[in-house]
Curated annotation (Swiss-Prot):
Biological function: This protein is involved in virus transmission.
Family, as annotated: Belongs to the caulimoviridae ORF II family.
InterPro entries membership: Caulimo_AT (IPR004917)
Regions that span the bilayer: none
UniProt source species: Cauliflower mosaic virus (strain W260) (CaMV)
A Pfam entry, by short name: Cauli_AT
Listed name of the protein: Aphid transmission protein
Positions of disulphide bridges: none
Amino acid sequence: MSITGQPHVYKKDTIIRLKPLSLNSNNRSYVLVPQKGNIQNIINHLNNLNEIVGRSLLGIWKINSYFGLSKDPSESKSKNPSVFNTAKTIFKSGGVDYS
């Protein structure tokens, strides 16, 4: 299988393969619209949405930390000084960024 056939991120001679949404061996199906209006179906519907949003958010955080947009202690490739610290130091040094 070629590398372009898989979801991946390429940066600085490093290829990171992305995991699919379903991390388990069984494929999950998400019902985004409850068929019936009872309370249990609505709860199941909201739980499905929470799981999708939660997994997406974790993936976004990992990608942001990899590209240096935020610091993630569990990711060794993320930038050590946060990009938010750059704004604090650049004005103190007269416009020169020493980080």
